Amino acid sequence: MSTVYKLKTSERAPKNEDEDEEYVPVQNGQGNKHSAGFVPIKQKVLVLSSRGVTYRQRHLLNDLVSMMPHSKKDSKLDSKDRLYQLNELAELYNCNNIFFFESRRREDLYLHIARAPNGPTVKFHVENLHTMDELNMTGNALKGSRPILSFDKTFDTAPHLKVVKELLQQTFGIPKGARRSKPFIDRVCTLTIADGKIWFRNYEIRENEDKSKDPVTLIEIGPRFVMTIINILEGSFGGPVIYKNDTFVSSTMVRAAIRNQAAQRYVNRQESKLERQVRAQQNVIPEDPLDNVFA
């Protein structure tokens, strides 16, 4: 009898179509009911790095993961030549965006942002990076909160910048109702273009209780870094190059130029030394016969 009673009580009551669906707010991204007309946007970012990243690069990656609750962090990728395998990895984890840190020579850091599985893919060179621990800023925001993405108006001036803006928006933008996200907006992420580079900053939105001051103040949290666009591929880690930055100079070429300058300075010193020896041999002072008169 108890089994029959449980089966009867577990049956759902018929739904009344005349009644409107009650609005239940989403808490921590786990709610199943939404307001009428709300369609959740499913965005999930696969975050991983290559072998050989330094501790500063690893800490920067961890800071970005803490800012993106809709991300899925995976272990390091062993191969740097077969990046197309990241598409299979993204499909395995049900991710539609890929955020990949590639480290070379333990000095240069490259960032790949791709839309899986069909692309496009943008490759950046990351420099001037500073983690939250290094900056030690006073700003603080709720972990898992959704940010306001502030893009420079320069992003709308060129077609390739519009593509970059869309990929950055899908990567750093946390959709409403995302998993592990909080229903709060208390920070601003700014992406500004200056000197042909993209500058990333993260600020806290703090309200001032003093009415004589501005009602809202922005306080930097961190991290901060600068990105330079290298190229844009049509596919996800493959396909034809649809944009290439001709003004980009790699760090390897810069270091090679510095070494060549140092080597050229050494060559110039040796040539000057040889010229002094030749002049000394050509301009020999003749012996004076009167030097040995009183000897």
UniProtKB/Swiss-Prot annotation:
Belongs to the BRX1 family. Its main location: nucleus. GO terms for cellular component: cell division site; cytosol; nucleolus; nucleus; preribosome. This is Ribosome biogenesis protein brx1. Keywords: Cytoplasm, Nucleus, Ribosome biogenesis. The gene is brx1. InterPro entries: Brix, BRX1. It holds the Pfam family Brix. The lineage of its organism: Eukaryota, Fungi, Dikarya, Ascomycota, Taphrinomycotina. It is found in: Nucleus, Nucleolus; Cytoplasm. It comes from the Eukaryota.
